[in-house]
A protein has these predicted regions:
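Glycine-rich phosphate-binding loop of ATP-dependent small-molecule kinases
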Residues: 1-215
Length: 215
């Protein structure tokens, strides 16, 4: 399947994407991952992106799209892909549309994960992340706590609350999402690609998405 996953921070895009990749071998693609991988590989595009990232600047859309094109042409994308958290803005959505037309790929659906704000706040304020950059296992102090001493089961490093997952920071991230990304819902509705899913259970959501794509 070839889909875009939309949803506010904490809507569960990553968890749902994982369930879907296990279903049909589609690969999960996020801009953060492809930028980091391009930098690590030392490609010309990666070197260019590294400059922006080291200065703490946003990587321009044109450069992101060039790196995205390289990624989508890789063999593992032939089975399908799940774009997790991209596009984020209307200009990015328009650029993605042009890119897909250029490389002859059609999206099956754009999935909007509609999760209430109070659920998102609860999920993210209770989330803890392993502080080891090579591990970064995700925990939740309610549903999947780390060890009793607050360390990671996998590597033993402290599991900490990220600075952008305090209540104040989350509210700011949600406000940014509503301003910049929510307009994509109307964009993809007009493209006749939008499927809105309201369930909170990741397996149930994955099942609904699979049914929608098969129609």
């Amino acid at each position: 399947m070839r889909i875009v996953l939309l949803g506010a921070p904490g809507a569960g895009k990553g968890t749902v994407a994982k369930s879907l990749t296990e279903f049909d071998g589609s690969v999960q693609i996020s801009t953060g991952d492809i930028l980091r991988n391009a930098v690590k590989a030392g490609s010309e595009l990666g070197k260019e992106a590294k400059g922006y990232m080291e200065r703490g600047e946003l990587v321009p859309d044109k450069l992101i799209m060039d790196i995205m094109e390289v990624r989508m042409k890789e063999p593992d994308c032939q089975k399908g892909f799940l774009l997790d958290g991209f596009p984020r803005t209307i200009p990015q959505a328009e650029a993605l549309k042009k890119l897909l037309e250029k490389i002859g790929i059609k999206l099956d659906a754009v999935i909007n994960l509609d999760v209430p704000t109070d659920v998102i706040l609860d999920r993210l304020t209770t989330r803890r992340t392993c502080s080891n950059p090579d591990c970064q296992e995700i925990y939740n102090i309610k549903s999947k706590p780390p060890k009793p001493d607050g360390t990671c089961f996998k590597c033993g490093s402290p599991a900490v609350q990220r600075a952008d997952e305090t209540e104040e920071a989350i509210k700011q991230r949600l406000a940014t999402y509503n301003e910049k990304t929510a307009p994509l819902i109307d964009f993809y509705k007009k493209e006749d690609l939008l499927v809105t899913v309201k369930s909170l259970d990741s397996k149930e959501i994955a099942s609904e998405i699979i049914k929608a794509v098969k129609k």
